[in-house]
């Protein structure tokens, strides 16, 4: 494989009503065999990311995916491949799963999401699964200066997540560089950012009603922060 070739991969974050999320182990014969991950696979030529995810979940686990919506995209360079990971969330699927490739799998809650070693990328971002769909006002806001990058930091009161507000596309890129868990933006900035592709971080759209949550999630937002 060419060192410069980027492989697009569809990644499914399937969440049950009780908040448990699907994880599976990588089967023997694949790189990182035995490591756990969010399931998914390579996007074939001519496929949408959603279509690739539908196919992969059926082939690997016998799960029928009804719908999914974009969450965020990130790139990672492994020893064997340079991948662009398109994370998509779904609560609309049928089936409990089958080990079609001899892998282990299960739905895990927040306190049990380490059934084994996780892939490095998944280990880094798995707590983002628990970000609420609606960001409430009960947050602490302060100013951070780190490596000459300035940002307004937003934390939930339990200090589980650290995010930032972004007023420009440049601010969004800074948030990615500073490895924040999420970013809060105005609707017009979110719309403008989509011209550059899928969000690079879980994104809250600020100043819109909670009733419009699914509208914004269908566009790629993680959630909303009401007025």
Set out the residue ranges of the language-model regions.
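Conserved N-terminal beta-strand and adjoining loop/helix that marks the start
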Residues: 1-21
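Active-site-adjacent beta-strand/loop module that shapes the phosphate/pyrophosphate-binding cleft
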Residues: 16, 74-96
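Conserved Nudix-box catalytic region and its N-terminal flanking loop in Nudix hydrolases
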Residues: 20-59, 72
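A short coil-to-beta-strand element that immediately follows conserved catalytic motifs
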Residues: 64-73
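NUDIX/MutT-family hydrolases
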Residues: 89, 97-129
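Active-site-adjacent beta->alpha loops and helix N-cap segments on the catalytic face
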Residues: 144-160, 168-172, 185-201, 211-212
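A structural motif
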Residues: 159, 177-180, 220-221
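Glycine-rich phosphate-binding active-site loops on the catalytic face of alpha/beta enzymes
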Residues: 182-190, 208-227
């Amino acid at each position: 494989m060419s060192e410069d070739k980027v492989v697009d991969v569809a990644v499914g974050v399937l969440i049950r009503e009780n908040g448990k999320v699907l994880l599976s182990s990588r089967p023997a014969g694949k790189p990182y065999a035995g490591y756990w991950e969010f399931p998914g696979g390579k996007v074939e030529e001519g496929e949408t990311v959603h279509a690739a995810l539908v196919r992969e979940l059926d082939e690997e686990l016998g799960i029928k995916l009804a719908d999914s919506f974009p969450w965020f995209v990130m790139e990672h360079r492994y020893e064997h491949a340079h991948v662009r990971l398109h994370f998509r969330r779904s609560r609309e699927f049928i089936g409990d799963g089958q080990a079609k490739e001899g892998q282990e799998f299960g739905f895990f809650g927040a306190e049990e999401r380490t059934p084994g070693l996780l892939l490095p990328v998944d280990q880094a971002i798995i707590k983002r699964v628990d970000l609420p769909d609606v960001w409430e006002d009960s947050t602490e806001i302060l100013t951070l200066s780190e490596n000459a990058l300035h940002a307004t930091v937003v934390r939930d009161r339990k200090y589980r997540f650290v995010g930032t507000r972004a007023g420009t596309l440049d601010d969004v890129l800074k948030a990615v560089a500073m490895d924040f868990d999420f970013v809060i933006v105005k609707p017009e900035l979110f719309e403008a950012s989509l011209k550059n592709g899928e969000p690079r971080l879980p994104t809250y759209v600020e100043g819109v009603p909670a009733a419009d949550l699914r509208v914004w999630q269908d566009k790629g937002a993680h959630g909303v922060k009401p007025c």
